Amino acid sequence: QVIQTRPLDGGAWEDVSGARVPTHRPLRVQLPSGRPFHVFVFHGPLSRDAAFAGILSSGERLLDTARGALDGIPEPSGMVLLASDGETFGHHQRGAESSLAEALLRCRLSGLARVTHLEEVLDQLPATHEARVASPSAWSCAHGVGRWSRNCSCRMSHHDGWNQEWRAPLRSAVVSLRDRVFSLVERHGDGLIRDPWQALEEY
């Protein structure tokens, strides 16, 4: 998603598309409004291995793979961010939650790294570079936001004849249903709810 970076104090933009995006510290993105917004880029190889390569089969294997990612950090105070769906742990991969707990314990006892959260990282490791992000884009799809509306080729299995052509008509049906519901809320909601739109937003 990040396509270019440059130092905060100015200079030329550097192309970081592909696998060259710096992932060891946050990046600052300037929104169209002029307000700054910080982004964190997850460690691609480590995150993919957690999802697909079986490293969550044991805490030791997860920690060994994470150690390799940590060794690649260009500065001692940098971070490594593993991004994964929460349902990976115990749903997609049975026992992965136990492996994660074991890896976190081993990490703490060995002093290899400190487990933290992104707010603390941003506080202690401020951005030194600003970034430009491809638009539109989604972290879970290499084709922009196509996986939510069309046959973008992202799929669970690569069986012959399988595709996602159903996405466009499904999206159209959901949008049509949304518009119909909005129409009904506008027509009948005032007599039932003090503020129908606020109720919808707070639902």
Which sequence ranges carry the predicted segments?
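Nucleic acid-machinery interaction/catalytic patches
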Residues: 5
